[in-house]
């Protein structure tokens, strides 16, 4: 059996929330989280494959620091995303662990395994062409793995968010 390529260090933890602003306030007040940076009022993901079918969806997204870890808050703005599915089925909570990977295709194949685990999302970010995917391996782990392609574009895009943890 060939060992899968080792994932790099954790990039962020993603939480699905009902209200991005309220979640930021609560995390700041209860846990000293922050500062937070918003990705805007609406991030619209176009031409994304969700469960293998083309769709689009919108989210409100904010990044912040919590105990030295970068966190992502995701508020679904419609019912077409895996985030909305998660919220309806499980309520607010930890949705995914994310990794920036230089060898996207190789890592995606390794994380999916054999037989391949469900590919919840396969797409690119809004207006930036950074490849990303959600893999749901199921089983006892119960948390989705997000892979984001490490590239000069993703480094420039995610740099300000990564700096939140260094403050």
Where are these regions (language model features)?
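Short glycine-enriched loop/turn motifs at secondary-structure junctions
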Residues: 6-9, 56, 90-93
């Amino acid at each position: 059996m060939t060992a899968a390529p080792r994932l790099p260090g954790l990039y962020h933890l993603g939480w699905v929330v009902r209200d991005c602003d309220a979640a930021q306030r609560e995390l700041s007040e209860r846990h000293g989280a922050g500062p937070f940076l918003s990705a805007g009022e609406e991030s619209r993901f176009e031409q994304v494959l969700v469960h293998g079918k083309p769709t689009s969806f919108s989210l409100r997204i904010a990044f912040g620091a919590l105990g030295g870890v970068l966190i992502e808050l995701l508020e679904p703005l419609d019912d077409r995303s895996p985030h909305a599915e998660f919220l309806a089925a499980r309520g607010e909570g930890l949705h995914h662990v994310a990794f920036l990977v230089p060898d996207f295709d190789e890592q995606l194949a390794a994380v999916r395994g054999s037989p391949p685990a469900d590919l919840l999302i396969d797409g690119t970010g809004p207006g930036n062409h950074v490849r990303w995917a959600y893999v749901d391996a199921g089983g006892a782990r119960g948390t989705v793995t997000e892979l984001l392609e490490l590239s000069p574009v993703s480094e420039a895009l995610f740099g300000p968010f990564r700096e939140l943890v260094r403050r």
